[in-house]
Amino acid sequence: MVARLLELDPGLTLSRSWTTRDRRPGESPEAYTFVDRDTFRARIAAGGFLEWTEFPGTGHLYGTPVPEATDGDLLLEIELDGAHQVKRVDPEAVLILVTAPSRAAQEQRLRGRGDDEESIARRLEVGDHEMEQGTRMADHVVVNDDVDRAAGEVADIIRWRRADPGGA
């Protein structure tokens, strides 16, 4: 969906997250900046992340580097903990929760990307918590039941917020 959203809105810049996990089979090396724990921890110590989190149960670290100046809006793909951190740094940040249409669809997507059973179970458990907390915290919730429709809805929200920054 993010790739489609970037096609629809050239004013968006996608922030490339860092992670300590290994690259999945078939995953593009450009999907993340893949680093070891020591490199990640050094970046934390240097204040180099806008937000970061350790994913529960896996020990993998994920983080969004402090953004360089950009002319457009910055798009972050982050977890709930990261969203809390971003809101503390920038209370005006717009949070859009994008969800799968159902828990079964979420599980199918995780299986489709090649995750192992243990990882799928952890993701689903975390996903249940994030759905509950995220819907309370998010400014907008979009159900990703169709990539083009969901990307279009997110693009519409962004256009609306640009036109009326204080809108809710």
Language-model segments: residues:
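Phosphate- and divalent-cation-binding pockets in alpha/beta enzyme and binding domains
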Residues: 1, 85, 105, 153
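Conserved nucleotide-binding/hydrolysis micro-motifs of P-loop NTPases
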Residues: 19-22, 80-82, 100-105, 147-148
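NTP-dependent small-molecule kinase module
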Residues: 91, 108-115, 132-168
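A conserved segment at the C-terminal end of the G1
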Residues: 1-10
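ATP-dependent small-molecule kinase phosphotransfer cores
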Residues: 17-74, 81
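Conserved phosphate-donor/acceptor-positioning beta-strand/loop module used by diverse small-molecule
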Residues: 75-79, 88-111
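Hydrophobic/aromatic beta-strand patches that form the interior of the parallel beta-sheet core
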Residues: 15, 33, 94-96, 140-142
